[in-house]
Amino acid sequence: MYIEKYWGEYIGGSDDSLSLLAFLEDQNKEEITLTEIFAKIGLEKLDWNFRQTTEYLGFLHSNGVETDFNFAIDVIVDIAAILLECKINKVVNLHDLDEYDAPSRNIRIIATTEELRSMDKALLDFTQNPLEYDL
């Protein structure tokens, strides 16, 4: 896995990471768009401003359990890493992201050029203004 060096250490190691993986697993499909992820977990309400998590972020799992996210920027950083993995290797195996609970199933996150630019801007803002974020 291309992102293996970072995943679980610097990225992918939070409660929000586990919630994101549960969400991706629950979608039961190989390909999911970034637009769909944003809509289903509530990130679209933040209008690409992830400094403060002012809106509820979460989803209703197919098993009936409400799963929430604490910090939008955690989810964005994790999604960015998964997007990078998908760019390099076309897919990512959920089991590689969580070897304890995730099934061995490939997924791919698809993003438009505009969405990728917006992700870049959000990550750049985070690196330049980390104390502005609610972590």
Predicted stretch roles:
Residues 1-40:
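N-terminal leader/targeting peptides and immediately adjacent processing regions
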Residues 2, 6, 10, 56, ...:
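Sequence-level detector for tyrosine residue identity
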Residues 5, 29, 40, 45, ...:
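Context-gated lysine
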Residues 23, 50, 54, 89, ...:
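Generic preference for flexible, low-structure residues
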Residues 29-68:
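Short amphipathic alpha-helical segments and their helix-coil junctions
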Residues 39-42, 46-49, 55, 115-135:
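Domain-length accessory/inserted modules outside core catalytic folds
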Residues 66-132:
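Amphipathic protein-protein interaction modules
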